[in-house]
Amino acid sequence: MEIMMGQGRLAIEKIVDPESFKENTIGESSFEDNEVGPGAVVGTAQIGDQDCTIIASDAMAMNERFPVVYAGIIGLEEGYKMAMAVYKTIEADKEKKGTEKRPILLIVDTPGNGPGKQEEIFGMNKSTGAYQLALAEARKAGHPIVAMVIGRAISGAFLCHGLQADRILSLSSKFETMIHVMPLTSVSVITKLDIERLEELSKTNPVFAAGPDFFYQLGGVEELVEEVDGMRSCILKHIAEIREMKAAGEEARLGPWGRGALGEQRGGRMIRGKVMAMMDKQFFAFAEQNLY
């Protein structure tokens, strides 16, 4: 069995039409400086004979200006480069109808964001926030966005590189894929719970578990893919479904809102709806007294 963790470039080859990937080119735009954000792989490919923007992280690359950015970590420059790729995609298709806008495919295999001192001083949050905003704007502009988890989908890096997608797919747990906020050692520090207790909880509680099966239960993944060679057909299927739903005005069933409802249907997020209803009630009560 082929483990895809750390092989983002190979995943691109397995998913897109043969020899169609043109790195650092989107529409009429190109990324000239290869030394900026070397851990971010962006470009255009064909998938099912349609143009598609590809955004991935390169686990083999290292950013020499930011020593903590390696092994697929999304750093300051990588976040901005990925955001720029999305905006170039929007610009390239701005005159096209919604049903003709190219899909954006996110290949997800990242252990997190760049946690270095330089990144925090310069504003790592601005970089990741810019990328999240770009994807949200592309989604609203009509671009189908599919995230394909092939390895690690962890912490703030997955927040910006994946969770804004219309649909999230993942290779199943037999490929050693990991989806979680942080390792249990970090959870232990924050919650003050013993690591032994957290390890027990992680076996049954999707909040603490790292596998894609638990995230599927929460509605965070629309579909688990059981074979590497099945990624392409699954992605094409979801692109077609996204186009149909957007054309029918059913955007609310896609993206973060759609996954929230999906988690409730699967029995993994049963309190979400009740909490949202309580918050709405309190907000409108406050608004009626103070805002209107």
UniProtKB/Swiss-Prot annotation:
Taxonomic source organism: Malonomonas rubra
GO CC field: cytoplasm
Pfam families: MdcE
Keyword set, alphabetical order: Cytoplasm, Transferase
BP GO annotations: carbohydrate metabolic process
Transmembrane regions listed in the UniProt entry: none
Annotated ranges, domain CoA carboxyltransferase C-terminal: 1-281
Location of this chain's protein in the cell: Cytoplasm
Physiological role: Gamma subunit of the biotin-dependent malonate decarboxylase multienzyme complex (EC 7.2.4.4). The two subunits MADC and MADD are required for the transfer of the malonate carboxy group from the acyl-carrier protein (ACP) to the prosthetic group of the biotin carrier MADF. Required for the regeneration of ACP.
Catalyses which reaction(s): N(6)-biotinyl-L-lysyl-[protein] + malonyl-[ACP] = N(6)-carboxybiotinyl-L-lysyl-[protein] + acetyl-[ACP]
NCBIfam families membership: malonate_gamma (TIGR03134)
Enzyme class: transferase
Name by which UniProt lists this protein: Malonyl-S-ACP:biotin-protein carboxyltransferase MADD
Gene Ontology molecular function: ligase activity; transferase activity
Lineage top rank: taxon: Bacteria
Enzyme Commission number(s) of this protein: 2.1.3.10
